[in-house]
């Protein structure tokens, strides 16, 4: 579905996305079931912040907590910490997640006081989790690469009507603690999909490839989201290759 969408074949992309959905979420015998509220709210120190049951393919890395600590730990200084502007109540978090019931807002962001007595907003998706029964072992070291929710977003993007698009997006919404929506224009649809990529795949890299595929000339500003946008050029979407790989080319 991803490849067909990149190739511009929306009909085939939709067909492939729906095939994954239909085969992966057969009622009563789901291969990739939606995350449950119990897994989100009732697991104490080991919530499934990854929504692991929805992941089609992932990397397994026993050093995941090291990556969390190197990039997202609240004890890092301001030049090292990857985080949003503001805090849970003000800044980018409430702009991106306006509904406080959004599972992703509750599970992926927190505030703590650091060693200089400053309250720090930090990203928690990859915090270490463990429990005596071993329930968290299935997602403790997981880095998601493909999710069932992406199939719904591809289906929404390639749908033939706004009502159909809203139907696919609402499938995600009701499993994120959110109300259903209606869509009134294609511009609104595009904005909703853009925001879903930002919320759903934060810390996973898929938003970058969405922006690249759409060749977006501007992306949301991290400092003043909802107000400013960062201008993009085509070259910004290209990763520099190592000289050892390019020096031998003719």
Each predicted region: which residue ranges?
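Acidic/polar-rich alpha-helix caps and helix-coil junctions
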Residues: 2-74, 80-88, 97-250
């Amino acid at each position: 579905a991803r490849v067909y969408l990149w190739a511009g074949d929306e009909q085939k992309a939709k067909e492939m996305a729906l095939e994954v959905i239909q085969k992966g979420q057969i009622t009563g015998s789901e291969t990739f079931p939606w995350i449950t509220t119990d897994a989100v709210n009732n697991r104490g120190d080991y919530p499934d912040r990854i929504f692991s049951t929805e992941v089609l393919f992932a990397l397994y890395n026993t050093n995941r907590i090291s990556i969390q600590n190197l990039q997202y730990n609240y004890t890092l200084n301001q030049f090292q910490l990857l985080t949003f502007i503001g805090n849970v109540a003000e800044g980018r978090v409430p702009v991106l997640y306006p509904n406080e019931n959004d599972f992703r807002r509750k599970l992926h962001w927190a505030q703590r006081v650091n060693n200089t007595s400053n309250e720090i907003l930090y990203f928690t998706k990859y915090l270490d989790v463990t429990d005596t029964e071993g329930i968290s072992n299935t997602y403790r070291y997981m880095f998601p690469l493909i999710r069932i929710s992406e199939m719904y977003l591809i289906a929404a993007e390639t749908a033939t009507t706004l009502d159909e698009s809203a139907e696919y997006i609402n499938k995600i919404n009701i499993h994120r603690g959110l109300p259903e929506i209606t869509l009134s224009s294609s511009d609104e649809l595009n904005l909703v999909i853009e925001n879903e990529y930002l919320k759903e795949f934060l810390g996973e890299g898929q938003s970058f490839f969405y922006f690249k595929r759409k060749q977006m000339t501007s992306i949301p500003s991290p400092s003043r989201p909802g107000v400013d946008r960062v201008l993009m050029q085509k070259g910004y979407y290209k990763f520099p290759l190592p000289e050892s790989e390019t020096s031998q080319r003719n």
